[in-house]
């Protein structure tokens, strides 16, 4: 944006999409594409009704700050995945968390997404790398 912080009324020369950046940051593009596909395929991430959100969304306790952990429970919004745990760790160090006990299939970790799974984690204790997201289900 050439240093323009509020480009709302700026011309196309400021607001045009620089498509070269897509190739330069192919890993980020693939990550966002995977997140979008995950949202499209799983109704738990598309609850459009406040009552559904209240019924299925549960924030899990965390020690300290800069970490958000929530659970989408009971096949939220008709999803095939029974329980989904989503963690956003903004800390500069790994976060050690307590989640409901069980065997989880990891679908998002370390900047990669694979709906078929990137591995397995076992609760109740999990460690999430610094400045990253983790999505897993059981």
Task: Show the residue positions of the predicted features.
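Acidic Ser/Thr/Pro-rich low-complexity disordered segments
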Residues: 45-48, 113-117
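A broadly tuned, weak detector of single residues within folded domains
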Residues: 28, 105-107, 124
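Loop/helix patches that line or flank the sugar-binding groove of alpha-linked glycan CAZymes
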Residues: 1-102
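C-terminal beta-strand-rich structural cap/linker in extracellular carbohydrate-active enzymes
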Residues: 118-138
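Solvent-exposed beta-hairpin/edge-strand motifs
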Residues: 100-114
């Amino acid at each position: 944006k050439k240093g323009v912080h509020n480009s709302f009324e700026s011309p196309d020369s400021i607001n045009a999409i620089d498509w070269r950046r897509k190739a330069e940051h192919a890993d980020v593009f693939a990550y966002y594409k995977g997140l979008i596909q995950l949202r499209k395929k799983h109704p738990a991430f598309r609850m459009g009704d406040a009552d559904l959100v209240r019924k299925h969304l549960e924030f899990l306790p965390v020690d300290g700050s800069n970490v958000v952990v929530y659970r989408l429970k009971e096949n939220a919004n008709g999803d095939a995945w029974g329980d989904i745990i989503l963690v956003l760790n903004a800390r500069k160090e790994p976060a050690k968390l307590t989640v409901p006990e069980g065997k989880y299939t990891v679908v998002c970790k370390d900047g990669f997404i694979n709906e078929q799974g990137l591995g397995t984690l076992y609760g109740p204790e999990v460690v999430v790398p610094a400045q990253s997201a983790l999505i897993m289900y059981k």
